[in-house]
Amino acid sequence: MTQDLEFLKQVLSVPTKSRQEGLMVEFLTNYLKEKNYDFYLDAMSNIYVTKKTSDDVEYFPCVVSHTDTVHKLDTINVVQEYLPNYQGEIKLSLKAYNNMDEPTGIGGDDKCGVFACLSLLEILPNLKVAFFVSEEIGCVGSLKADKTFFDNVGYAIQFDAPENWMVTQYCYGQKLFDEQSEFFIKCEPNFKEMMPNFVLESHPYTDVYSLRKLFDFSCINFSCGYYQYHTRNEYVVVEDLYNS
């Protein structure tokens, strides 16, 4: 992953809230235009991106994130601090404050996912990316996902779990993948390397729940380094995000 701290700060500084996602959608569309990526928006403002550099691609990997947060719209000044990860180690972290120096909630849930998707789009030769609206109020965007976009998707990965040790196997009661599947057998060594204490978990809904419900491909979701999510004191441990 492109370890671009300034770009990460830029992504995290975009204010966005469920049903008030215009600034994030604008940020993403401007970025995608600047990079000349092939993308489109649907009527809900879900964003669908395809990067194809090989002619023989039959099925694409797909990464997804959501463009909303739970935090009210406010000025976001991203500040570097040193804060604990799950293991209690003090790490370089990012936290958000408004112009009155009050914590606002940085919205790593799921701006960390947005950053991860954009970073992978930069480095992988063939990839599909979906940015869904209003996940926090019931997967509103992903439940209306454009089915034609996913016709040639082989699997979907979401970056939308807190801290640095969680892998979502069940999401809102929906089984996302089989432990004995070729998909997870290929995933597992990467988790053991970058997330050595990972645990398979059952989590509330996120967008891969919708995709697994709608389509016949494996999905997975895992930790991407945000802590104290849905609170004003939310922060992002940079190393954990890069590892994801």
Question: How would you describe each model-predicted region?
Answer:
Residues Q10, T16-E58:
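A non-catalytic alpha/beta surface segment that caps or lines the substrate-entry region
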Residues M1-R19, H230-T231:
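N-terminal capping segment at the start of a domain
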Residues M44, D56-P61, L124-L127, D151-Y155, ...:
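Short coil/turn connectors at secondary-structure junctions
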